[in-house]
């Protein structure tokens, strides 16, 4: 019942959030009549609203996964998917002087919903970026039956027993919804995949094992 409520609420919030974003954009279009202080306040509201939009999208996605609303499957080339994701985030990595390395150790093709496959890769890579060190490194390894995302990061290991919980606070940073790894876990459960976390030599590592 709780999951159903969250799903319904997330669906209903889409339109009001979109309306708010449009109205803010209209205000910005009137920038010549606004002071710098007013523009600064609008920018703060926009950042908060962007966060709420991301949060709502994640909640809606989790609700759809829970309700089995992704029945369509096809053969997904994970090697190509990882390359596209890396290219999409290239400028973001450069902003923090982070190095991205793709280790292509073998072809990995899996049968699953392509949108959900994209969510797994994107959320793992974004998690590595958010929790990685500026000037650090992210290494994504694609092998015949395994996807690994590792990053250098300050601090010790995360709480492996709760890191995939929804709204887990221990790993949450400013701007993060706290739902990315929960989405990864939900998709893996849906397809019977194994996702695990480890911490070795100052590196956080997430692995997803695919059945033969």
For each feature predicted by the language model, list its residue ranges.
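Short acidic helix/loop segment immediately C-terminal to the autophosphorylated histidine
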Residues: 28-39
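Short conserved segment of the HATPase_c
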Residues: 156-167
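Short alpha-helical segment of the dimerization/phosphotransfer core of two-component systems
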Residues: 44-52
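Conserved glycine-rich
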Residues: 192-193, 197
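Conserved catalytic submotifs in the C-terminal HATPase_c
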Residues: 74, 99-109
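Conserved micro-motifs of the catalytic ATP-binding
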Residues: 67-72, 109-112
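Short helix-loop "hinge" at the ATP-lid/N-box region of the Bergerat-fold HATPase_c
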Residues: 128-129
